[in-house]
């Protein structure tokens, strides 16, 4: 049976930090935009449908789609440039892929030098056809990263008005706090789902809650593994979530999104879909909370054992 969403369904707004950047609580991830086989007009229609649901924040990275995803989004945005001031654009940099589009790259590696951060931003702005990014993230921690150099690059980009807010992705608590002491960070985007619960237990989320900073959560549905396949433990987790969803009369994925957003540091989950119905399911997850019993039932099934 098809789930019917109320016409008034809207994603709420959420501040990443006190007096900081405000995003939609659900963020539309653009990683796979090149796989959606949409024309520029169809991409624009999808963007507009997301925004009608209150999903005004769009997550990119320079490398997505083998360096093509930002350009596909920018091409669509150029058809309706007035939308730019009604949305928030997030992008990432710091990874250099082996790619025919980057013939100068001899090996896949990280680069968090000031020069690369700056050139990546310039390229993202051109591709997205905008004059500023609302949020720039360092994509992954780099063994050669110099916190002072990164902070200096951030400061110069902010002064130039090319990037309004800054953060990181996949950083440990210590790495985050080391850079945050040098330049105020808005968020840490990390993997989090019932099949990847480490941020709850490795102090990543504790540290962010202590600072009053909300993380962003990528792969909230575990890359689709929650829906099919997996071992007996995953199958049991799937059944537990399904039972809760049936009892609450909510879509399966809405329960997962609600579970993620119930963590006290207030994560903002990313979608990865080109189907507006699936975005609506994510937004519905903002409309209810789980009982503690149901929340812990999912955690128990995810970990395969009771809490101590």
Task: Name every feature range the model reports, one short phrase each.
Residues 3-10, 141-308:
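Beta/alpha (TIM)-barrel catalytic core signal, keyed to glycine-rich beta->alpha loops juxtaposed to Asp/Glu
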Residues 21-26, 54-57, 83-87, 130-134, ...:
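Short, well-ordered coil/turn segments that N-cap beta-strands
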Residues 43, 47, 114-117, 121, ...:
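Aromatic/hydrophobic pocket-lining residues that form the small-molecule binding cavity
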Residues 1-88, 307:
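N-terminal binding-site loop/beta-alpha segment at the start of enzyme catalytic domains
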Residues 116-137, 157-160:
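CE4/NodB-like, metal-dependent polysaccharide N-deacetylase domain
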Residues 29, 61-64, 136-139, 169, ...:
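Conserved residues at the C-terminal ends of beta-strands
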Residues 84-111:
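Structural motif corresponding to the early beta-alpha repeats
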Residues 30-41, 103-115:
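Active-site mouth loops of central-metabolism enzymes
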């Amino acid at each position: 049976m098809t789930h019917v969403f109320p016409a008034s369904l809207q994603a709420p707004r959420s501040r990443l930090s006190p007096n900081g950047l405000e995003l939609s609580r659900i963020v539309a991830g653009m990683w796979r935009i090149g796989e959606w086989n949409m024309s520029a007009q169809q991409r624009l229609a999808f963007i507009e449908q997301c925004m009608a649901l209150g999903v005004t924040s769009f997550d990119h990275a320079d490398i997505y789609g083998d360096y093509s995803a930002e350009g596909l989004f920018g091409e669509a945005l150029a058809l309706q440039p007035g939308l730019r001031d009604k949305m928030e654009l997030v992008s990432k940099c710091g990874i250099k892929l082996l790619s025919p589009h980057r013939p100068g790259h001899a090996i896949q590696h990280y680069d968090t030098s000031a020069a690369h951060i700056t050139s990546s931003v310039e390229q993202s702005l051109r591709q997205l056809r905008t004059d500023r990014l609302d949020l720039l993230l360092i994509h992954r921690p780099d063994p050669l990263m110099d916190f002072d150099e990164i902070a200096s690059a951030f400061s110069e980009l902010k002064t130039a008005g090319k990037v309004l807010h800054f953060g990181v992705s996949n950083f440990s608590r210590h790495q985050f706090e080391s850079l945050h002491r040098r330049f105020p960070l808005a968020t840490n985007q990390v993997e989090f789902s019932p099949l990847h619960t480490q941020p709850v237990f490795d102090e990543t989320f504790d540290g962010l809650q202590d600072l009053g900073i909300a993380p962003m959560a990528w792969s909230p549905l575990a890359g689709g593994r929650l829906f099919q396949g997996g071992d007996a433990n995953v199958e049991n987790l799937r059944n537990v979530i399904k039972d809760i969803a049936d009892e609450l009369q909510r879509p399966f994925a809405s329960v997962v999104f609600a579970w993620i957003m119930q963590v006290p540091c207030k994560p903002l989950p990313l979608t990865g879909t080109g189907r507006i119905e699936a975005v609506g399911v994510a937004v519905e997850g903002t409309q209810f909370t789980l009982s503690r019993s149901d929340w812990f039932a999912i955690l128990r099934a995810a970990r395969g054992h009771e809490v101590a």
